[in-house]
Amino acid sequence: MTQLSAAQTPQPKPADGNRALYGGKINRRITVRDITAAKERGEKWPMLTAYDAMTASVFDESGIPVMLVGDSAGNCHLGYETTVPVTLDEMTMLSAAVVRGTSRALIVGDLPFGSYQEGPVQALRSATRLVKEAGVGAVKLEGGERSHRQIELLVESGIPVMAHIGLTPQSVNSMGYRVQGRGEEAAQQLLRDAKAVQDAGAFAVVLELVPAELAAEVTRTLHIPTVGIGAGPDTDAQVLVWTDMLGLTGGRMPKFVKQYADLRKVMGDAAKAYAEDVVGGTFPADEHSVH
């Protein structure tokens, strides 16, 4: 009989009645404690990005338990070519909007490039703004071993931290957009990074563009939840950029993106129909007019 490796062994799925995060009975604001408890139950959960109150409200009503106000807003919302130009002021404004648009989801605010790299004190100042001014329930920052001290101080100060290792978009100028953790040395470094952020007190860690087998090993090794994006099916949670997932981004999508709708076409068709009605004089009709 062929034996399955630990990475291939099917993991038990909780019964629907044991769900707490998605499809569960939590009708209050979800907390970090709820997230860590989900790993203990073996409950998987979804996370989506959000950058504005209206979109966030739709996802909140749909039961999405965690939303990331990512610095991916730079590409998807603000018109930048990368995430690097995004400022802390912009992240604070966007995070506050998402918090206002939700009542249940845990909102995680991204610390943008240049807001924590100088050291723990700068990281604390920046994270405090997101918590105090925007009202987020946690912050996210990139880096493994190199961000250990920042994470440690934030957690000691009462600010929950979601770490982010593997492909870290803020380092695109030095790393490029490529799979991380291939090869023995790179895999061992990623494992060290994962353990470092856990030891520093992070409550979860994003694994981006990491070989599925390595992501599975990290997930088995850590006691904190792993959140995959391009990291295979065995992480504790999954995250996608909402404009990719709903087909608004356009162009060629990364291999790991599953497109669940084609909003770009829906919106484009609607805009054209509206324009034709205006030009043709059929809008506004009598039922759209005040008398």
Swiss-Prot record:
GO BP, sorted A to Z: pantothenate biosynthetic process
Task: From the record, give the transmembrane residue ranges.
Answer: none
Intracellular or extracellular location(s)? Cytoplasm
Name the domain of life this protein comes from.
Answer: Bacteria
- Record's cofactor remark: Binds 1 Mg(2+) ion per subunit.
Metal-binding: is it a keyword of this entry? yes
| Residues annotated for Mg(2+) binding in this entry | D71, D110, E142
Q: Which cofactors, by name?
A: Mg(2+)
Q: Which Gene3D superfamilies match?
A: Phosphoenolpyruvate-binding domains
Class of this enzyme = transferase
Q: Which pathway, metabolic or otherwise, does it act in?
A: Cofactor biosynthesis; (R)-pantothenate biosynthesis; (R)-pantoate from 3-methyl-2-oxobutanoate: step 1/2
Record's keyword terms, sorted: Cytoplasm, Magnesium, Metal-binding, Pantothenate biosynthesis, Transferase
Q: Which reaction does it catalyse?
A: 3-methyl-2-oxobutanoate + (6R)-5,10-methylene-5,6,7,8-tetrahydrofolate + H2O = 2-dehydropantoate + (6S)-5,6,7,8-tetrahydrofolate
Q: Does the keyword Cytoplasm apply?
A: yes
Question: Molecular function terms in GO for this entry?
Answer: 3-methyl-2-oxobutanoate hydroxymethyltransferase activity; magnesium ion binding
Q: Write one Pfam family the protein is assigned to.
A: Pantoate_transf
Predominantly, its location class is: cytoplasm
Which GO cellular component does the record give, naming just one?
cytoplasm
Q: What is its EC number?
A: 2.1.2.11
Q: How does it assemble?
A: Homodecamer; pentamer of dimers.
Q: What does this protein do?
A: Catalyzes the reversible reaction in which hydroxymethyl group from 5,10-methylenetetrahydrofolate is transferred onto alpha-ketoisovalerate to form ketopantoate.
- Classification via HAMAP family: PanB
Q: What is this protein called?
A: 3-methyl-2-oxobutanoate hydroxymethyltransferase
Q: Which gene encodes it?
A: panB
